[in-house]
Amino acid sequence: GHPGFGRTDYQPVPQNVVHVPQPFFYRCELGSRSPAECAERTADAVEQAILFHGPDSVSAFIGEPVSHPYGGVVPPDGYWQRVREICDRYGVLLVFDEVITGFGRLGTWFGADYVGITPDIMSFAKGITSGYFPVGGSIATPKVADVFNETPFSHMYTYTAHPAGSAAALANLEILERENLVDNARQRGDQLERRLLDMKEMHPMVGDVRGAGLLRG
């Protein structure tokens, strides 16, 4: 995918957003020589950005557990663990965008499960209804959600909480569980990976095969 897709048309409207290097060893922006070094350097870049702008001015770090726009990039081992520690140290919320990775795409229910990290907030859409009806939402830990019990605020749209969307989501979740589709995505993803690796051996122009479950690049 193109990293600028969906972003450049709206700049500079989303102001006060700071971007950090992608934890992508194959094309590491920081010249890392190993996956472990890439994880360390890109996580360090997150901490450096927080310190440069001041922890009090940084509300959240937002990322996909496995990057979809870059073509199924799975961060090197240790990256998300380190980012979680950094966010906790400076009081920064960790937000996972699970619109693509949620509800079985990676062979786990959520990308958070795949990388073994609990975010403070998780956004989701698409997969909750398998695309049959437009539904999206957010899930938050008690640390975040309990604040709104004390100081609620109105944040909704005309068609928020449409009953047809709720019905579609519940029916879809039932099918995902009944037909074991999450584990099926894991098994089919393993098969796809093997085929892609075979193709890589046959075609020198293919430099990298990556991804998880049925999100591959």
Residue ranges and their predicted role:
Residues G1-G217:
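Conserved N-terminal phosphate-binding loop of PLP-dependent enzymes in the Aspartate aminotransferase
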